[in-house]
Amino acid sequence: MKEVTANFSAKDIEREVQEYWRTHDTYKAVKEQHSAGRAFFFVDGPPYTTGQIHLGTAWNKIIKDSILRYHRMNGRNVIDRAGYDMHGLPIEVKVEQKLGFASKKDIETFGIEKFINECREFAIKNKELMDAQFENLGIWMDFKNAYQTIKPWYVEAAWWTLAKAQEKGMLERGYRVVNWCPRCETAIADAEVEYWDETDPSVFVKFPIRGKVSESLVIWTTTPWTLPANVAVAVGKEFVYARVHAEKNGREEYLWVAEDLVKSVLKKGRYQKFETLETKKGAELIGWEYDSPLMDVVPIQKEIAHRVVAADFVAMENTGMVHIAPGHGWDDYVLGTKEKLAIVCPVDGAGKFRPETGIFAGKFVRDANGEVLDALGERLLATEKITHRYGHCWRCKTPIIFRATSQWFLKASEMRDLMLSEVKKVTWYPEWAGSARFYDWIKEARDWCVSRQRYWGIPIPVWICDKCDKYRVIGTIAELEKASGQKVPDPHRPFVDQVTIPCECGGTMKRVGDIFDVWFDSAVASWATVGFPAKTDEFEKLWPADFITEGQDQTRGWFYSQLGASTIAFGKAPYKSVCMHGFALDAEGRKMSKSLGNVVAPEEVIAKVGVDVLRLYVLSSSAPWDDLKFNWDGIATVNRTMNILWNVYRFPMPYMILDRFEPEAKSGHWDGSFVRSHIRELPDEDRWIVSRINTVAGIVDASTKECQLHRATREILNFILEDLSRWYVQLVRPRMWLEGESEQKIFAYETIYYVMRRLVDLMAPFAPHITEEIYSNLRCKNDPGSVHMLDWQACDDALTNRELEHAMELVRSFDDAVQNARQAGKRKLRWPVDEVVIVTAKPEVKDAVARLNEVCMDRANARKVTVVIGRWDRIGWHAEPVMKALGKGFGKNSFAVKGLIEAADGNAIKAAVDAGQKFQLKIEEGKISKPDDLKIGTDYEQDVVEIGIEHVRFTEKLPTDIFSAPMEDGTVYVDVALTPDLEAEGYAREIIRRIQEMRRQLDLAVEDFIMVDVAVADKRICELVGASWKPGIADEVRAKTLSLHHSAEPAGSSHQLAKDWDVEGIAMTIGISKVA
């Protein structure tokens, strides 16, 4: 062991520790140490390689790292391969921004191969950057062999999975409505749609009923641009609709609107007169035909047979009739399929109208809203603005549209029951993440559109014949090379697009142009990361994953995509347990964003307080599944606790080194045997701290197993602050100063060493740097080379003592109460008091104080501490009248009775009412009215008034110099009266404190001796202290010589340090010098 610097520098420690890990390849050594252990197969949810990690990503990896370190220390062979999502729109959009591209046309002009190379280079460069960022956070994962979705073997895992789906009849080519980003010109998943408010038109439109004059159905929509694709109007079967005769500006017409909405709709249309002529149920309207109000300007509308249909999603709002465009809405599409309506989608991939829309051709749909309204003319009943939640592309933030296109789908809806069954077999942290949130999401599962119309991704391995339209799904690169007779150097676009396969019909099979949904990439991670399907050994041994953890948004993302792909491919869930964590937000609960200026980067925190503080903060500030509301005050609190830990670790070092202390370690290997074998001999405070660290270990162990990392880390931080620093160190400090050979000192050394060794073991998964640093100084000759190579030590039940822990808790409550009572009595803790009394009704308080009486006396700085069960005879009671009760009982005499109570003996009144009796007050003549004025029974013949417990309340009446404060299950009374003896000790302690402060200013070592000169201006105080405390002062401050004399003169400049002090109003001058 070596002495430790007083200045705690997290950054220096972390830099040195990480260099130590690199030099000694500690991560590899730890992995090899547990290679024969039971496997713990972890699958890393892959972040996109788009640049700098943010606070949420850091939190995610810290959670993972803490859990993996815990399992390694428990002897598990942890499979901890890192992973990266390196395909998809996240990468493409970043590269497009870099190249200044605005559309797919720009990419095509630039060249697909060049664009793919740019994406690959961008993804790899950022992967390397993120590797370094994660390693700087102290993350121990296999980054050298990280799975990368761009690797050929990974691509094969996705291809194999799709081929398996085809084999099981779970792959379908279909023309359906999907979420569509018009900027990226691709389908996007439901989980990729982000919602925020947009302001759109809110329009009411008249659809003329075929064969009727001036008679129309009134519909409402917020997407006028979809009207060129209208094919039907939906009504509610059971709704009642009204035929309304309406007049405006002398023109009459007939409008059909839901009866309950007639007034609001007609008012919006500014009709001067209107009346309901008849009503019909929605069921009676089914089959009615109508014409499009745009049929004269949109050619395609002339070809559509428009009619009224029923739908269960129609609501009694707006007009009660819904415009149906099956090519532009999911509900509309489902209804259109059911009703065999035309699926019309006259919009191209860029969101522009096709030629069949006539006057709107070539216009971007959302920009055309105004022109559509103009074209409606008199068919536009009313228009307003509405602000509502609208979906946007997750990557480029463009408002999405719904668009019917030809896509490839996995039949997830047919696997719904199996997925729900499998979810129940998974252990979820928290439980409701699976049983409620995820379960509910799966219940609504639709078929999964796995195709995307982009470039940088895993190409969909489907080849279609240009002659017979037959298609073939390829499962591996080898299969493709065999079928095509061509080498496939890179399974990405555009190379794989050039590979053709001869068809049996004589035609040529060419690959479809689509790539996989990037969620499909990560969906196969749990089998791809073990080399499946090319290798099967590890898959058969390890799969499914033991554990995964990601953010709550992954219930719709990675948790779901994995489950969908796995149930289709293997018929079971790909993971055994899942921890869902929250989002990293700012202190006000807002999402961090550059526009709000509230982004806090991990590097910013690390630069200020270091990695371990960041780790402990994000782990302790909230439960993993709750959102993390970052605030700097919380960071500061954890940072203070780390400084306190450093000071506690540093505290015994000078004494241990001076005494050449070596912990008992058999064969140079420490195992805590000294404490276990001497536990009954140790002082109570040592036995207590040993019990506490083991109790904490049990809580930390149980909490970490259940992913309750907040509970585990809070328990550790609280132990450091409350148990170790504020309590145990204060109790044990005097024993560190004992001279020579001392059993009590050895007990203290062995105990604090034991506690620190156990503490760094417990903290290692959460704060790997500071624990490594402390361990490196504490470890014995043959101990493992790293704290992370230690075996995890849970609670040692043989060393726990719940009774002692409870007793000490009572004593700590006593300690707080003593300080409060002293403060009330203006008596500092440094000044002794003669007696402290505890009054309680609980025998266990008396037992605790009796057992720990020396601790109580030491902490209270009292000559004696006693416990009284029931009542202390020095405490009196003052009876205070309860006027409300007196008024009710004595009426106008209540003030007279009040005076009698105040003048009476409070102790006597309390004794009577406590015994359940009435107390009689003697009436003074003239004070009380005639008996018939009294409302309660009194005996006037004896001249008394009876009062009960309801008439009075009691406050303590303390003797002079006695002050009280409440404690758990009792009250503490402190006698602050000073005797000459107590006064002498008080001044002596004040002098000692100041000399010790001057020793620190001279930076003296613990063992250094000094010469001291104390001049006291007050003769009485000088004589009082000198008579009994001069040797005691010299001993405490390690003074070879001590001069204590009465003088108002300075001590002189012959000393190394001389200072004037005001000691409780007494002027003193103290000079000290180190003895050579």
Swiss-Prot record:
SUPFAM superfamilies cross-referenced by the UniProt entry: Anticodon-binding domain of a subclass of class I aminoacyl-tRNA synthetases (SSF47323), Nucleotidylyl transferase (SSF52374), ValRS/IleRS/LeuRS editing domain (SSF50677)
One biological process term in Gene Ontology: isoleucyl-tRNA aminoacylation
GO molecular function terms listed in the Swiss-Prot or TrEMBL record: aminoacyl-tRNA deacylase activity; ATP binding; isoleucine-tRNA ligase activity; tRNA binding; zinc ion binding
InterPro entries in the record: aa-tRNA-synth_I_CS (IPR001412), aa-tRNA-synth_Ia (IPR002300), Anticodon_Ile_ABEc (IPR033709), Ile-tRNA-ligase (IPR002301), Ile-tRNA-ligase_type2 (IPR023586), M/V/L/I-tRNA-synth_anticd-bd (IPR013155), Rossmann-like_a/b/a_fold (IPR014729), tRNAsynth_Ia_anticodon-bd (IPR009080)
Entry's EC annotation: 6.1.1.5
Coiled-coil blocks: none
Domain of life the protein comes from: Archaea
Pfam families listed in its UniProt record: Anticodon_1, DUF5915, tRNA-synt_1
Motif 'KMSKS' region: where in chain: 591-595
Function noted in UniProt: Catalyzes the attachment of isoleucine to tRNA(Ile). As IleRS can inadvertently accommodate and process structurally similar amino acids such as valine, to avoid such errors it has two additional distinct tRNA(Ile)-dependent editing activities. One activity is designated as 'pretransfer' editing and involves the hydrolysis of activated Val-AMP. The other activity is designated 'posttransfer' editing and involves deacylation of mischarged Val-tRNA(Ile).
Family: Belongs to the class-I aminoacyl-tRNA synthetase family. IleS type 2 subfamily.
Name of the protein this chain belongs to: Isoleucine--tRNA ligase
Gene: ileS
